[in-house]
A protein has these predicted regions:
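A charged, aromatic-enriched C-terminal amphipathic alpha-helix characteristic of glycosyltransferases
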Residues: 357-362, 374-404
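Acidic anion/phosphate-binding donor-loop and adjacent secondary structure
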Residues: 203-217
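Carbohydrate-associated surface elements
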Residues: 181-184, 202
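Acidic donor-binding loop of glycosyltransferase active sites
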Residues: 176, 297-316
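Membrane-proximal helix-turn-helix segments that form the acceptor-binding/catalytic region
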Residues: 109, 116-120, 133-136, 148-178
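Short N-terminal targeting/anchoring amphipathic segment
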Residues: 89-110, 123-130
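N-terminal subdomain of nucleotide-sugar transferases
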Residues: 1-57, 177
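Nucleotide-activated donor-binding/catalytic signature segment of Leloir-type glycosyltransferases, i.e.
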Residues: 254-256, 261, 267-295
Length: 407
């Protein structure tokens, strides 16, 4: 008989809809594991799946700012969202029937719910931390502004961070096992809970595989959110394109940068591009559905990953899913600027592409693959040991940890 897993996670919001959980549930051995997923419902997002039972709890009833602020404060002070989720779970399923509880989050919610259910029903608890507050170092990283005054915002956010870290650690300490997504995260969290395991983000090998698709233009492609241009910094690429254009080595009818970013930072990025006077090389698009991403990446000549150098002030251990999807299709990866840390190391070890530190490197990289595209109509790189990053392999690692905890 299959063992039942009660999975708690943060909301399924676009454009990715928590791919780590989706892929885990899809790739678990159905004869051994039966996942049931509980999360928060996102307003105006009608996400559902037939892969596993999915229960979504409405918490925010509308996008009204007053309503949102009230519910946010209520949750900050009393963790009301976790309280409501526990009631929602107990009203929709029998927790006694599950063999273990698994909670995956990028922040705090729903860790407290997971801990309380684990304690109440005496169930083993495994925590998957996809992001942690400390990875941002001294940077402030919140998506909502409470005040129009920056210093007041920063003060409030720092107090919230301290409270959230305290609440998070209360659960981490009690967990039977922890999983996380980068060597930096592993080393940091292991100091709190020694039974911590590294499981990178990855790619679905069933849909992200190489195809030799010829294209009429040499496309440098970026997909996903672009929240902060200081954190995800494209300057090395823009300067390289500017110089190559001035040197008459590329033209906008042959080379394009395609930004699939929706409206996130579109205006700010457009203004930055204008400073380099290379508007004709750039095209903007809305987010694309997940099922179209593999084909898009395969059509690309270079897949772009934006980050910045890791300093003693952060950020640390940022390993975007987009990188792993790019190596799945075996297209050249251009990472600008190199983090000179975890991501750069994996790029080097896998021969996936370039983690750039200067403009000349970027120019040389673009020209090399541009020449390959001119010869063949497509580009390709031989990625080393990419199978270790497949979602299928990750599911096997998760299953091993589940079994160890249940022994």
């Amino acid at each position: 008989m299959a063992k039942k897993i009660l999975i708690l996670t943060d909301p399924f919001d676009p454009p990715l809809f928590v791919p780590r959980i989706n892929n885990l549930c899809k790739n678990l051995d159905k004869n051994k594991w039966e996942p049931h997923v509980f999360t928060e419902k996102v307003i105006d997002v009608n996400y559902n799946t037939t892969l596993y039972p999915l229960y979504q709890m409405p918490y925010y009833k509308s996008k009204n700012k007053l309503h949102w602020t009230y519910k946010w404060i209520l949750n900050l002070l009393f963790q009301n969202k976790d309280i409501q989720l526990q009631k929602f779970i107990e009203n929709n399923t029998n927790v006694e029937d599950y063999d273990l509880i698994f909670c995956s989050t990028f922040n705090l919610f729903p860790l407290t719910t997971a801990r309380k259910l684990s304690t109440k029903y005496n169930k083993p608890l495994i925590i998957d931390l996809r992001d942690i507050t400390e990875q941002w170092g001294k940077q402030v990283y919140f998506s909502h502004k409470i005040s129009k005054f920056t210093k007041l915002n920063n003060f409030i956010y720092k107090q919230v961070e301290k409270l959230n870290i305290k609440r998070r650690n209360k659960t981490i300490i009690k967990a039977n096992a922890i999983t996380t997504i980068s060597p930096w995260h592993h080393n940091f969290i292991q100091k709190i809970n020694p039974n911590t395991h590294l499981i990178y983000n990855g790619y679905d090998a069933n849909i992200f595989f190489p195809q030799q698709i010829k294209s009429n233009t040499f496309d440098i492609t970026y997909t996903g959110r672009l929240i902060d241009l200081n954190f995800r910094n494209p300057n090395l690429l823009l300067e390289a394109i500017q110089q190559l254009h001035k040197e008459n080595k590329i033209t906008p009818d042959k080379v394009t940068i395609k930004w699939y970013i929706g409206n996130t930072q579109k205006d700010e990025l457009s203004n930055l591009i204008k400073q380099y006077n290379i508007e004709s090389y750039n095209n903007f698009f809305d987010f694309i559905p997940n099922n179209e991403i593999p084909n898009l990446l395969n059509k690309s000549s270079i897949n772009l990953i934006l980050t910045n150098k890791t300093t003693k002030e952060g950020p640390f251990g940022i390993m975007t899913t987009k990188f792993f999807e790019a190596i799945g299709v075996e297209k050249p990866v251009l990472c600008v600027r190199s983090d000179e840390d975890c991501l750069a190391q994996v790029i080097k070890e896998t021969n996936a592409g370039l983690a750039a530190t200067n403009v000349e490197e970027v120019k040389e990289f673009i020209l090399y693959h541009y020449n390959q595209w001119q010869k063949h109509g497509y580009t390709h790189v031989d990625v080393k040991n990419k199978e270790q990053f497949s979602r299928q392999n990750q599911a096997l690692i998760f299953e091993k940890i589940f079994n160890q905890v249940l022994e």
